[in-house]
Amino acid sequence: SRGLGDVYKRQTKLIRERGVMNGRLTSLRPDSAAVEDLKGWAITDAVAHVTCREPYQIPSPLPRHHVVLWDFGAKQNIIRKLHALNCDLTIVPASTTAARILSYSPDGIMLSNGPGNPKDNPAIISELSHLCKSGIPIFGICLGHQLLALANGADTEKLKYGHRGANQPVKDLLTGRDYITSQNHGYAVKNDSLPDNAVLRFINLNDGTCEGVSYQDFPGFSVQFHPEACGGPHDSEFLFREFVALIERRA
């Protein structure tokens, strides 16, 4: 209706000026207690609600490598991309320990996308810090990118607006090339918090925030955007091949 349209218009202006905030659609005028409750509301245990419950395997018809996919809410297309590169996959829940992951003898470890504040996952961050010492190639996407950064001593921050949509431009500082990427996140790794073992590789061309990191003391890298996007731009699909190349160099 026209009235509903006006409501959305007013809220859009408010968000534009003040940034992302909690909201509630109601036909009643809320009292002060309801407003305070809304201000304090936050998503909790987001990853626990979207991860798989038990480990499972997806064999490749022409297996060349074995990859453990640590599932924080993995998109199906991550599985498809790895499978297309002849990777046998073992998908494990977010609660899996580093020791358990290593018991699968993976050639590579994939850290999936997922929801929520990365700092809400201290147990995962702790386990991931152990995996970084294993020498096994690691590739992180979205939340996986943020968790890998935190495990190496970097910091993250909540963005005022977040990055949403299938047309987010990023620059590869290694090659100088620009790419159009698909993104959907409200947190970012802080550029100035990267440790000495990390190199900023990708930046967002709209606001300069971190979009990807390469690590110098172990074979690992990560990106904030979604190279597996479907539908969406396929510009950065080559990152899956880079991951497989890391695996093959270690073999």
Please give the residue ranges for each predicted region.
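Catalytic beta-strand/loop cores that center a nucleophilic Ser/Cys/Thr
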Residues: 176-218
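Cysteine-nucleophile active-site neighborhood
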Residues: 108, 112-188, 232-247
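Short helix-loop-beta junction
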Residues: 76-91
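Redox- and metal-dependent alpha/beta enzyme cores, enriched for Fe-S-associated oxidoreductases
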Residues: 78-80, 94-104, 111, 139, ...
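Residues that mark the start of a beta-strand
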Residues: 64-68, 88, 137, 180
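Short, small-residue-biased leader/transition segments that mark boundaries at the very start
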Residues: 1-8
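A glycine-centered loop/beta-turn motif at secondary-structure junctions
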Residues: 212-250
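Flexible inter-domain linker/hinge segments
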Residues: 13-66
